């Protein structure tokens, strides 16, 4: 789950990190009034969406009057911001962050992520702040400094000092950097984060370090023990179908094809999409119904898949281990009848009671095509999607 910038900065402030004074406004009037509360004669206004590239898209602006703030808010509130990280429709803007202006002498990058290869939290820092870190990693990987955090000891001050020296910071700045580094490391563990970024972490004209941005993502598997963070969830920033799927504990990702896929198991789901592609088809989605593929979940999965008007056929690929294939077949039949599926449905069942499941499908009298193998299923569904 992602947080908005203003929410991330609220967390930063709780952990003693230096952030700008800011107010998230929901109306143009609130945005203009925020300038009086913040004070000063220059402000930065930022459209709040879960996407990078806002500056290039016009979603961030330096202003020097309340009239400019109000004009910016009127332009974006209620509208969609399109950046290189969004789809063609963009993401809706429901809040504008108004912040005090910070004079910048230099820009750095600081971030942390769970690294699967080392099975550790890894911090990354770079002198190339304010730009896309992916681009830096690709073109000049030597400019990215790393510190791997041992889960037994946690982040250590010496690691922060080592990064600070390599970033070219002076002694006072290294002390500030150490406090930021340790604060972020504690927050990462306390809040069950999957990723955090400060891009840029700036050096002000006075020579102090300041967190100018905040990107925070929480591990969705840990949301049950982070109720306060769960309240910060903004469903408007998610694909409507993906949000619906999450309510039913279905893993769904929308794609651009015309063949709907319903599979139990993430690995099998990816393999299914690969073989559909191999035989000339285009998957419309990734959908993992998991181990508990009950009739109710299959019904909801059908509803989600068929809410995409591009879907011309559906492939169901189930490996029966704990789940019996005959029960899955009954669930599929019930779902097809309840939802009123109008497109061809190809089903491949393998494993526990697979033959019985195939018989249940054959005896149903519905337009359900039982495949003999995964290859056969892919060939059949591609033909069905093409109307052959």
UniProtKB/Swiss-Prot annotation:
SUPFAM superfamilies: Glutathione synthetase ATP-binding domain-like (SSF56059), Succinyl-CoA synthetase domains (SSF52210). Its EC number is 6.2.1.5. It catalyses: succinate + ATP + CoA = succinyl-CoA + ADP + phosphate; GTP + succinate + CoA = succinyl-CoA + GDP + phosphate. Mg(2+) binds at residues 199, 213. The keyword Heme does not apply. One of its GO terms (cellular component) is cytosol. Its cofactor is Mg(2+). ATP binds at residues 46, 53-55, 99, 102, 107. Residues 9-244 form the ATP-grasp domain. Succinyl-CoA synthetase functions in the citric acid cycle (TCA), coupling the hydrolysis of succinyl-CoA to the synthesis of either ATP or GTP and thus represents the only step of substrate-level phosphorylation in the TCA. The beta subunit provides nucleotide specificity of the enzyme and binds the substrate succinate, while the binding sites for coenzyme A and phosphate are found in the alpha subunit. Belongs to the succinate/malate CoA ligase beta subunit family. This is Succinate--CoA ligase [ADP-forming] subunit beta. It comes from Saccharophagus degradans (strain 2-40 / ATCC 43961 / DSM 17024).
């Amino acid at each position: 789950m992602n947080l908005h910038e203003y929410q991330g900065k609220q967390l930063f402030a709780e952990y003693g990190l230096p952030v700008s004074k800011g107010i998230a406004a929901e109306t143009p009037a609130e945005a203009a009034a925020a300038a009086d509360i913040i004070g000063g004669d220059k402000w930065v206004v930022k459209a709040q969406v879960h996407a990078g590239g806002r500056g290039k898209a016009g979603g961030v602006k330096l202003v020097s009057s309340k009239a400019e703030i109000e004009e910016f808010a009127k332009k974006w509130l209620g509208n969609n911001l399109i950046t290189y990280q969004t789809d063609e429709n963009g993401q809706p803007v429901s809040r504008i962050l108004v912040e005090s202006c910070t004079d910048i002498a230099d820009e750095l990058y600081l971030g942390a992520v769970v690294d699967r290869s080392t099975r550790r939290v890894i911090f990354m820092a770079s002198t190339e702040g304010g730009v896309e870190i992916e681009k830096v990693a690709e073109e000049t990987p030597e400019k990215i400094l790393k510190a791997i955090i041992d889960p037994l000891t946690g982040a250590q001050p010496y690691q922060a000092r080592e990064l600070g020296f390599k970033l070219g910071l002076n002694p006072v700045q290294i002390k500030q950097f150490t406090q930021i580094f340790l604060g972020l490391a504690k927050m990462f563990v306390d809040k069950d984060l999957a990723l955090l970024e400060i891009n840029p972490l700036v050096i002000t004209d006075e020579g102090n370090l300041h967190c100018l941005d905040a990107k925070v993502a929480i591990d969705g598997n840990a949301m049950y023990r982070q109720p306060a963070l769960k309240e910060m969830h903004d469903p408007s920033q998610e694909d409507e179908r993906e949000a619906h799927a999450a309510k039913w504990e279905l893993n769904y990702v929308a794609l651009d094809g015309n063949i709907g896929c319903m599979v139990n198991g993430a690995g099998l789901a990816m393999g299914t999409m690969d073989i559909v592609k191999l035989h000339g088809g285009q998957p419309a989605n990734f959908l993992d119904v998991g181990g508990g593929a009950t009739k109710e979940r299959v019904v909801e999965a059908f509803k989600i898949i068929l809410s995409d008007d591009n879907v011309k056929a559906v492939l169901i690929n189930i490996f029966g281990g704990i789940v019996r294939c005959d029960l899955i077949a009954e669930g599929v039949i019930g779902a097809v009848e309840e939802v009123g599926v109008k497109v061809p449905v190809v089903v491949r069942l393998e494993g526990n009671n697979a033959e019985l499941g195939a018989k249940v499908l054959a005896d149903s009298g519905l337009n359900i095509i039982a495949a003999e193998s995964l290859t056969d299923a892919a060939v059949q569904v591609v033909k069905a999607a093409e109307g052959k």
